[in-house]
Amino acid sequence: VRLVDPTDEALASFVPDSLAVTLGGIADACRDGLLAVAVEAGLATALAIMNEEADALCGAWNARDPERDHERGGTTPTSVVMGGQRLPIRRPRVHALDDNGKRAGEVGLASYGIFAQGDLLNRVAVERMLAGVATRSFERAADPIGAKARKAASSTSKSAVSRRFVTGTRKALDELLGRDLSGLDAAVLMIDGVDFAGQMCVVALVVTADGTKVPVGLRLGDTENKTVVTALLADIVERGVDYSAGLLVVIDGAKALATGVRSVFGDLALIQRCQIHKRRNVKGHLPAKARDALDARLRGAFADPDPETGLRKAKRLAAELDKTHPDAAGSLREGLEDMFTVRRLGIDGTLARTLVCTNMIESMIGICRDTSSNVKRWRDEGDMRRRWCAAGLLEAERKFRRLRGQRPDAPTRHSARPSRRSCHATVRY
């Protein structure tokens, strides 16, 4: 049985035709389950492949070849990655020979480099910690590789797991912030902020023309201020997001978000403000006994199939509130035109209900919060918050489904320099 991908050239040439595994070792491992057997066989395979590579360099044992340019140097204790842990093994050593037959230095075995690489351990550490496994519980949550192997294993201590998690999440951060976005057919952009231990992390989510959701960036700051938002959007544009055909941008009620969007995208962005946030803000300015009735009227105005009729209803409600609750009226009027952008684009049904609020990006943010819920002590470094946030965003991406209500003829883009009252679709979902 070949225990390696034959397309892996680094290993394929060293895989032995046969493999000897001691019956005693297999029998002991069988008592601990199939994975323990696999680990026992895997260690034997790794050793056999390394010996095969040493034979290819040095020739057979006791060959006494005067033309050889490498010789064996015994073995040395080291470790390889098996079953999500580091397990001890004795690696053969090979030395290069100079023209006089003298040792010129040790030669690294390519096969050992593959077996010893720690990328798998980093991924295991990140996935388990994002799933809520604490560093102190990591050893108990490790794969059942057998009592003998577990006793000899390393890399499961709190400090080792923590180091690997930092490495893995830093890689996730680099992946998120380094993505080439030029290939995305961006139709919708959502922006919102998530609090990480007193600091605001502004995140961005793109929905492509086929309904795929893609987290595209994050920026750390004290609040959702214009500077942070503008820097985030400028970075997204620099990495290739094409908005030349227009972009629907969905945000909550924060003025800084709208200001940042307009400063970067200008007239090529149509802003849809979150209707749920608007209703919540207006209700917050009303006495408890008046909230339900007024919220029902506002909800009805937002749901009107004719956006201009809905806008008139909302303005009429604001005029009524001027007399009794002027603060609620002011809250309602702020950004009111932007509440009907999706309706003006001719989008209705489930897709419209999805795009008139920020629930989609808030769901992603909720996963970020869940993955970091076990953190008991946030250090002062901004890097820690950015790493956790990036890892949470990529974890959320794995759980995404395509946009609900997506249909082939639903317009989400508009012609250049559109008016707010009339948007002409140029790209279809």
Segments from the language model and where they lie:
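RNase H-like nuclease fold core
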Residues: 23, 56, 62-63, 70-75, ...
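Conserved beta-strand -> loop -> alpha-helix junction used to position metal-binding or nucleic-acid-contacting
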Residues: 218, 248-255, 260-299
